[in-house]
């Protein structure tokens, strides 16, 4: 893809059809900056928000409540740029995966800075993504490419 925005839009609209709901927090890049997926004339998706802790991590009870509302996709950002660059620990991702599986919905990860997170955490990028059904990462963030995302 030419950009992370397009990569995320393709993922969101692959998992959801027009008018379906996506569970995410209101600070995520996918919502704050890439809003077109939520415009009626483009993606037509409806945002449902979960809350973050003071540390910038998803509040599990808030996610569980959102999943009960009939959403079709759980969207996460890892690392979460607008939450201070917080890295979502595997323990948190595993709990979120369990909740999503119970609800029968996929997880999309906006991993724009995935490889930065891998280096900082000492984890393999595939391990960080292991609980997601789809992942977008930018080749222009820490990998030296002038633009592009996968």
Feature map (PLM): residue ranges:
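Conserved PLP-enzyme active-site core in the AAT-like
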Residues: 2-150
